[in-house]
Every structure is written in C-alpha cells, then in structure tokens.
Amino acid sequence: MPILLDPVRAPALDALLASANTQGLDWRIEAAADATLPRIRGIGTLASAGPEEISFLTNPRYQSQLAGTRAAAVIVTPDAAQALANDPSAPACARVVCPHPYLLYARLAQWFDAARRPRLPASVHPLAVVAPDAVIEDDVRIGPHCVVEAGASIGRGSTLGPGCVIGEGSSLGPDCLLHARVTLYANVRIGARAILHSGVVLGADGFGFAPDPTLGQGAWGKIAQLGGVRIGDDVEIGANTTIDRGALEDTDIGDGVKLDNQIMLGHNVRVGAHTAMAACVGVAGSTVIGSRCTIGGAAMLSGHLTLGDDVHISGGTAVTSNILQPGRYTGVYPYAEHGEWQRNAAVLQQLSQLRRRLRALEKA
C-alpha cells in the first residue's frame, strides 16, 4: 500500500493506536527502552512496508518475511512477540502485541482510510433533484445528478455519490455511504452505516410470472411484486449486486451481512445476521439463509430452501436441498485434464447401473 499521510499529519505509533477504534481489543507496544516511537504514515505488507509504515503478521506462511521487513512497527500475536524477543535476528522495529492482529490491522486501515478522505461539508449539489417532501437530515451530502423521490428520507451523516437514485418512499439510516450510480427502487429501507458500491440495484421486480394461456400457448403473465427490500444495520453490498423486492412480503437482509460484487438475491430471500457471500453467488427466490453463514464464490442456491445457522458452502457448490445442520458443505466436481475428465464423467453416468450390478453380485 502506498504511504497515505504527509509527514505533518502522521501520528506517532502510540497516538495512532489511541485514536483508532480499538474497542474490544487488547494491545500493547513493545519497543527498546531508549527508542522514540516512530511516526506512522501508512500500512504495508511485511515485504513492501517502509520505515514510516506499520505492518502485521497473521499468517505463518509469511513468517520468513519478518526478518527482512523494513516496517517501523509490526502487529503480532503474543506468541509471536515472545518468539521474537528470544530471536537475536529479529527486526529491531517496534512491536504491537495483540491477540487479534488481523482485526487490529482492519481497524487501523479504517482509520487511515478516513484520514486520507476528510469528510466533506454537508451539501446538495445544484444538479441533484430532490422532491419537496423528501426528508434530508443534517450533515448529508448529495452529489450531482442524484434523484431523491417523493417521500424518501436520507439519514443524518449519509453520503450519496453522483447519479444515485432513491425511489419513492425509500429510506436510508444514519451514516450510510452510497457510491456512484446506486439505485433504490420504491420502498427500500436501509439501516445505519450501510456501504453500497457502484451499480447496486435494490428493489427491482422479482422474477414472478404465471402461465397465462389467455395470452397464447406457453405465454406468461406478470405477477406484480408488491413487497419491498429491508436492509439491516452495518451491511456492505458490493458493486453490481442486485436484490429483488418481495412478491408480497419484503426481501430481508439482516444486520452485519457482507455481500461481494455481482451477487443476485431473488425475491423474498431472507439472510440472517453476519452472513457473508463471495462474488457471483446466486440465490433463487424464497430461500432462507441463517445467521453467520459463509457462501463461497459462484455457489448457486435453488429456491424455497432453508439453510440453518453456521452453514458454510464452498465456492462453486450447487445447493438443491435444505441444509439444517451447521458445518461445511462442498459439491464441486474436481477439475482434471480434459481427457481424464471426460472418462470420469462417462463413469459417473453409469453409476446407478454399476450399483445395481454390484448389489446383484453381493446377493449371488
């Protein structure tokens, strides 16, 4: 990561840790008694960090990079700190000892991100269109070409990037950040501190159609989607992810849910608190996903299913039935050289026949 702060604004290590959000984390600084604590201008990896940056060690695979790091300070676990204290070849940099170094790194990254992007004053750009009855609370920033429709409300401290659309009756809680070109259809409700990346679309019609022979053989009649979308607090939604409105009830995304880019959630889907999904996941309508689940990239979930709490789906898995017990589930056919894959696929197609033959032999 490049150095983020100019030297004048760079805090000393202890001041940085005191001003960052370290709530719930125990940490201490270990440095030579006669050492002056360094000023920290940014964060870097062990390999790339310079003498004005802080780094971190969380994965034992990078232990070998520690001896050669040029970082001014390194975040390590108590066990790693003890090992370094007994290692004469250990780097002379300051050590920040914390049982959760990756989480502390995340908190410091948040601090630097906020420091390099100072909060802009509240304003409504002259090229924005805001309905007369829309409610805009204090300290809100609305960028150019935004549209805020009738009855919509924007919570205190929220920011709308250029080109965002907030549909009729939709609402944002406090301290939300919508990047450029986010679209909320009508009746979308979002809680506090949400982050929505560019291209997110919430509240488009669910894929609901009824066979309608009055329109012709094989024709479909549209089912009006009368529900909305509800998003909880502290939710982050990645670029170009779409969540459809419910048919009758709301599509519901719980507190703390994290959605990667290009995910599609169908109508009436419900996702429990603190569940995370990687890119390109597809969830068909009316499926219920529990709390604290993880779903790997490109996994596909059929409609009208239930996944219990603490279910973990590997990337690329197709889920076609309920999973009620916690645990990790994988349904990915392993890749192979193409010719070998074709031979294995041919065997798979004959499994039921081979099973019958085996049973017959066992009975003989």
Swiss-Prot record:
<comment type="similarity">
    <text>Belongs to the transferase hexapeptide repeat family. LpxD subfamily.</text>
</comment>
<comment type="subunit">
    <text>Homotrimer.</text>
</comment>
<dbReference type="GO" id="GO:0016020">
    <property type="term" value="C:membrane"/>
</dbReference>
<dbReference type="Pfam" id="PF14602">
    <property type="entry name" value="Hexapep_2"/>
</dbReference>
<dbReference type="GO" id="GO:0016410">
    <property type="term" value="F:N-acyltransferase activity"/>
</dbReference>
<dbReference type="Pfam" id="PF04613">
    <property type="entry name" value="LpxD"/>
</dbReference>
<feature type="active site" description="Proton acceptor">
    <location>
        <position position="267"/>
    </location>
</feature>
<protein>
    <recommendedName>
        <fullName>UDP-3-O-acylglucosamine N-acyltransferase</fullName>
        <ecNumber>2.3.1.191</ecNumber>
    </recommendedName>
</protein>
<comment type="function">
    <text>Catalyzes the N-acylation of UDP-3-O-acylglucosamine using 3-hydroxyacyl-ACP as the acyl donor. Is involved in the biosynthesis of lipid A, a phosphorylated glycolipid that anchors the lipopolysaccharide to the outer membrane of the cell.</text>
</comment>
<dbReference type="InterPro" id="IPR007691">
    <property type="entry name" value="LpxD"/>
</dbReference>
<comment type="pathway">
    <text>Bacterial outer membrane biogenesis; LPS lipid A biosynthesis.</text>
</comment>
<keyword id="KW-0808">Transferase</keyword>
<keyword id="KW-0441">Lipid A biosynthesis</keyword>
<keyword id="KW-0444">Lipid biosynthesis</keyword>
<keyword id="KW-0012">Acyltransferase</keyword>
<keyword id="KW-0443">Lipid metabolism</keyword>
<dbReference type="InterPro" id="IPR020573">
    <property type="entry name" value="UDP_GlcNAc_AcTrfase_non-rep"/>
</dbReference>
<dbReference type="InterPro" id="IPR001451">
    <property type="entry name" value="Hexapep"/>
</dbReference>
<keyword id="KW-0677">Repeat</keyword>
<dbReference type="InterPro" id="IPR011004">
    <property type="entry name" value="Trimer_LpxA-like_sf"/>
</dbReference>
<dbReference type="GO" id="GO:0009245">
    <property type="term" value="P:lipid A biosynthetic process"/>
</dbReference>
<dbReference type="Pfam" id="PF00132">
    <property type="entry name" value="Hexapep"/>
</dbReference>
